[in-house]
Amino acid sequence: MPPKKAQTRRIVSLDSLFGHTLLNITGEPVTPTKIAIFQLIRTLFHAHFGVGAVPSLKPFDKDEKTRVFTVLYGLIIMKSEISYDDFRCIVRILNDGLGRSIYYRFVTSMEKLAHGEDQIEMLFEDAFYTAKRPNHEKVLKREDSWLDELTFMNSNSFLYIWIKRVMMQYTRTSQNGTFEIAEKFQKWIISGTLEIISHPILSGINRALPTEIDCSIRARHWCAAQLRLVQLCPTKAMSYFQILDWCDTIHRRHHDVVDVHLLRAAIFVQLKNSSDAVKSLKQFFDMSMLEITENSKHALETLKLMSPSQVALRFGPILQGRVHRIFGERQIASALFAESIQQSQVNVDDMCNRIANMEVTINSIYMSGPLLQRLSGETFAAGKKEEESVENERRVQQNSVHAAVDLNVPTLRSLQKNFREDYELHAFLVSMCKFLLCIQDMMDGKFFKHNSTADYVSVGFHRLRLLLDMNNKGFVLQAFANAIMTSGLIQSGMYHQAKRVAETMIVSNCDAPNSPILETESHAVAGVNLVYSLAAVGDYEKAQKTIDILKNRFPENINWMAARHVDICSKIVNFERNFLLNKYSECSRHLAGLETSAPLEFVLRKSLLLAATGKLAEAVLLLGTYECGDVRGSMRIHMQMATIHTAYGQFETAEIQIQEAGKVAVNAHFLDANLLVVRRVGSLMLGRFMAREAYQVLHALSAKIEHFGSFIEKAIYHVSMARCLRLMHKDPRVHLKQCKAQIIGNKWPAMEKLLLTELTILHHSGGLYPDEQKEMKAKERFGKIEADFPGPCTWMFI
């Protein structure tokens, strides 16, 4: 009997089902939103359990866990993708109830993934599964061991299974697939606009923040960008009140962004709010008193990542002193700079010592009014009340930085984070110190004397040009130097040269994609000096158009530190223009406000106006009582008093004042000083009817008047020469033509009437060249000008 066949039964093959788990499991498609959910779960786990061996200080309680998993389950059951902005709003709402910097940690991890600083890893540490913390020799075990076993998620929960599915799907993804996932994730983060989620509470802490400040990293970049724009191009920055609003939001949401207080201080300075600016600076340095420990061994031994920093004690007084200096509180600023010097010496900080000493020099020479003018006598008198020992100590400290500016590298402590930036800062300080010495010589009237100052400065500028100039320090100093150069050229009567330098600086300041048109104080000074040079050659129309352009570029409510130079320039130029037109009431209007912004210019013009209107005693008293500490200012005051006394026939007193002005001119470097003084000597002699002696004095100035004279000086010179020649019975017509060429276009109608008077006398029947027709034409022209511009010519007062 044949054997029976073995009966086989078809059963399910367990090996075929579970032998290849990665191939047979139903995976969860990996999308950017699910990666973000994975990162959020990891962030929440660290907040509950801790990181590695370091436990969490405040694990989640039952209510907090309920809130956490309500949000997580709501996210994983969503059928569609949501934007990154909406996801951040959800995390912010969760952070509102939980705290523990969940939003900050989540956004930081996401930004690192987006910028490639970290890789996308769909994994958890072992503690996520075991709920047990690893041992570490530096971390003490708790007395109650059960406190170290914090279960975050049940392994049988739907969320746990969902996580496993996502992890499995990502693990079996090919390399090209992971690249595509990373690329989509990066685009998901950086693309799209903010789409407000439908939540009943969208104000306060739950209010959706602008993308620029929705995390600490972006907030720092935004603060740095706005601070740069506020300093270099204020009109391109956001409105100041909007910046303050965003700063308040950053201060509430991102406590680690301490730079926001520095930005607020800069905004308060622009708003002329010195008290709040100082408060913001104090907050900035209070928040920066701690720094990350650089010694990792010390950090592991002490379990402290932060250590106290003494930088604020050294550099805090410098910034606060700058604020006080900007607002004219120079004695307070001087005391703060002295405190910074002491702190730098105690802490052996050579760089801080250099900066503080440089600020002491700037505090003594850099004014809030016109450049290259010394402080008035009243300020000096107040400064002399300080103790003599303090002044001597400060003078020694001042000389120490001047003796040390030739060092090639900083000797002790570095301020910047890398050597290149530190060397750049050092070279900037060296060049700035040399440049300040140059400015001191220019203000003292000895820059063009035979000394080494010019070579000293050129060495500093050459060293600065060798830098990469990462933070535009060299560019800022170069713009400052060009502005000072234009001021120095105008002070020496080199108006055409000043015009070329100012135009070059303005034309080169063009708009670029990464560098907008600069609107610094240096560029405002260059524009103002362009106006002065145009007015000096008689082009008032173009000067006025330039003033209008400057007022639009440097508005008072946005950039008041630059706008003050434009305001001073506008008042001075318009005063001069109206004075030549005999519009004295308009001149009085332009003097309003000039007394505080430019006291020397106010005194000179006020006295000129008083003298022209017959108030001799008041004019002389105003000039005599003003204590001037400026070299060129003293010379101008003596010349002004001399011309006033000459116009009123008080020749002996005028001669004394001319001699005093000559003493200053002889010892000063100003190239036009000799011209200005000697021309007034000629006017004095002409007033005494000493025509031959006046002609000899004035004739020696023929070359200088063409190089260093303004159109007013040239007109007075040529009409004086013409009168001298007429009184000497010689032909004055050449000088009369040259005088007419200077005042053509109704720039000085009163001088034109004086010119017509000379022509009438010259062509009179008893004159040198009798011509009845020319005489009548001169009289008719005189009558027309008198009808339009009545009043005498006050050239003797100038």
UniProtKB/Swiss-Prot annotation:
Outcome of gene disruption: Double RNAi-mediated knockdown and/or mutagenesis with gfi-3 results in increased embryonic lethality and the production of one-cell arrested embryos.
Tissue: Expressed in head neurons, vulval precursor cells and in mature sperm stored in the spermatheca.
GO CC annotation, single: anaphase-promoting complex
Keyword annotations from UniProtKB, A to Z: Cell cycle, Cell division, Coiled coil, Developmental protein, Meiosis, Mitosis, Ubl conjugation pathway
Statement: the UniProt record of this protein carries the keyword Coiled coil: yes
Pathway entry: Protein modification; protein ubiquitination
Family note: Belongs to the APC5 family.
GO biological process: anaphase-promoting complex-dependent catabolic process; cell division; meiotic cell cycle; positive regulation of mitotic metaphase/anaphase transition; protein K11-linked ubiquitination; regulation of meiotic cell cycle; regulation of mitotic cell cycle
Superkingdom, taxonomy of origin: Eukaryota
InterPro entries assigned: Apc5
UniProt-recorded name of the protein: Suppressor of spindle checkpoint defect 1
Function text: Probable component of the anaphase promoting complex/cyclosome (APC/C), a cell cycle-regulated E3 ubiquitin ligase that controls progression through mitosis and the G1 phase of the cell cycle. The APC/C complex acts by mediating ubiquitination and subsequent degradation of target proteins. Required for the metaphase to anaphase transition in meiosis. Plays a role in the segregation of DNA and centrioles during meiosis in male germ cells.
Source organism of this protein record: Caenorhabditis elegans
Any coiled-coil regions, as ranges: 339-359
Known partners and oligomeric status: The APC/C complex is probably composed of at least 12 subunits: apc-2, apc-10, apc-11, cdc-26, emb-1, emb-27, emb-30, mat-1, mat-2, mat-3, such-1 and gfi-3.
